[in-house]
């Protein structure tokens, strides 16, 4: 994958989760909730502060994160793979 996010943005590949109903039935497709966990595939250089310095991001390629999929999250298909482009502010936690 040849993509480089700008500034404080990251490229995330959503991790698939297997959802099971209360009765033990495995839910797939539209019946299953979409995961809000993903793996960081690429990171930007960082956020530009008011004084002009660049604050590096707190995440790195390979980190598994929990994210908020709200306004401003862009879905793209790159090399046949769906990825999300989001700001570091949309990341809620690093797992592990």
Curated annotation (Swiss-Prot):
CDD domains: cpn10 (cd00320). It comes from Shewanella baltica (strain OS155 / ATCC BAA-1091). SMART domains: Cpn10. Keywords: Chaperone, Cytoplasm. It is found in: Cytoplasm. SUPFAM superfamilies: GroES-like. Its main location: cytoplasm. Belongs to the GroES chaperonin family. It holds the Pfam family Cpn10. GO terms for biological process: chaperone cofactor-dependent protein refolding. Heptamer of 7 subunits arranged in a ring. Interacts with the chaperonin GroEL. GO terms for molecular function: ATP binding; metal ion binding; protein folding chaperone; protein-folding chaperone binding; unfolded protein binding. One of its GO terms (cellular component) is cytoplasm. Together with the chaperonin GroEL, plays an essential role in assisting protein folding. The GroEL-GroES system forms a nano-cage that allows encapsulation of the non-native substrate proteins and provides a physical environment optimized to promote and accelerate protein folding. GroES binds to the apical surface of the GroEL ring, thereby capping the opening of the GroEL channel. NCBIfam families: PRK00364.1-1, PRK00364.1-2, PRK00364.2-2. This is Co-chaperonin GroES.
């Amino acid at each position: 994958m040849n993509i480089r996010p700008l500034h404080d943005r990251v490229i995330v590949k959503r991790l698939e989760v297997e959802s099971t109903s209360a009765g033990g039935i495995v839910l797939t497709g539209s019946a299953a909730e979409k995961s809000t966990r993903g793996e960081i595939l690429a990171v930007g250089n960082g956020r530009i502060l008011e004084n002009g310095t660049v604050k590096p991001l707190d995440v790195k390629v390979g980190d598994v994160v929990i994210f908020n999929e709200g306004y401003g999250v862009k879905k793209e298909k790159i090399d046949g793979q769906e990825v999300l482009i989001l700001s570091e502010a949309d990341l809620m936690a690093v797992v592990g």
